[in-house]
Each structure stands twice: as C-alpha cells, then as structure tokens.
UniProtKB/Swiss-Prot annotation:
This is CASP-like protein 5B1. Homodimer and heterodimers. Its main location: membrane. PANTHER family: CASP-LIKE PROTEIN 5B1 (PTHR32021:SF48), CASP-LIKE PROTEIN 5B3 (PTHR32021). Residues 1-11, 64-77 are cytoplasmic.
Length: 152
C-alpha cells in the first residue's frame, strides 16, 4: 500500500479530519445562530449535511488518534474501501448542500434583494456559513481523493 499525505492513521490524516470537523462545526454554528434559517430547505439541508460530515470526520479523527498512539496500520483494503465510500458520500452531500445554499443566498442577496427588504434576515451569516461549507467540501474532496489513490 502507498503512503500518502492524508493517509488514515497518520498525523496529516488527523489534521485533515480535524479541519473537516472544525469547518463543519463552524458552518453549523453560524447557520444555526442566524435568524429564520429553518424556513428555507436548503439551509436545513446544509445543517444536516454538515452534521453528518462532523460525525463522520470526528469518528475517523478518533480512529486516527488511536492508530497513532498504538502505532497500528489502518491501511487494510477493507478499511480503505469503507473510508473511501464514506468520504465520497459525505463529500457529495457537502457539495450538494453548499451549492444549494449558495444558490439561495445569491438569490436573496443579489437577484431579488430580499435581504434589503427583510433587514431581520441574517444574510451575512448565510454567506459565511456557505463559505465554510465549501471549504469543508474542499477538505473532504482532498480526503476522498487520497483514500481512492491509496486504494488503487
């Protein structure tokens, strides 16, 4: 098996997973703290998707910590297949949620100027949360590509 940056059970893999956890948690926190987000399906999907990403990344980060402390190898083909499929699923969900939320945010801020008509709406927070979710997707894409290349 190849040893690459971001491999499971390495310090770089742990840093990648912790980055995914941090951006997912920040995206959820910013979105949930904004006013009236729950009335829009795309924003609820973003919170659900980032919640799944947070759980998945935290679980794999804990597994990385365990492997680093025990100096064990997590690169068996069965584990790598599981990690690859899980990373691809969570990365695609994160991308879909980020894109749909970005579409709604652009519609509110640029196209209809709904944010100017409704000053109580937290459009700046929507934009920050969407930006964090795109950064989360970028980290998830790196992780999923790394897993795929280690697997083949």
């Amino acid at each position: 098996m190849k040893k690459m940056i971001g491999s499971p059970g390495t310090m770089s893999g742990l840093i990648l997973r912790l980055g995914q956890c941090a951006t997912a948690a920040a995206s959820i926190g910013v979105m949930v703290s904004s006013y009236d987000f729950s009335n829009y399906t795309a924003f609820c999907f973003l919170v659900a998707s980032m919640g799944l990403q947070l759980i998945w990344s935290f679980g794999l980060a804990c597994l990385d910590v365990y492997a680093i402390r025990r100096k064990s190898d997590l690169r068996s083909p069965i584990l790598l297949s599981l990690f690859t499929v899980g990373d691809w699923v969570t990365a695609l969900l994160a991308l879909a949620a980020a894109c749909s939320s970005a579409g709604v945010t652009v519609l509110f801020t640029k196209d209809t100027e709904f944010c100017r008509q409704q000053p109580a709406l937290s459009c700046d927070r929507f934009q920050i949360s969407v930006g964090l979710s795109f950064f989360n997707w970028f980290l998830a894409a790196i992780s999923s590509h790394t897993m795929f290349w280690i697997l083949i």
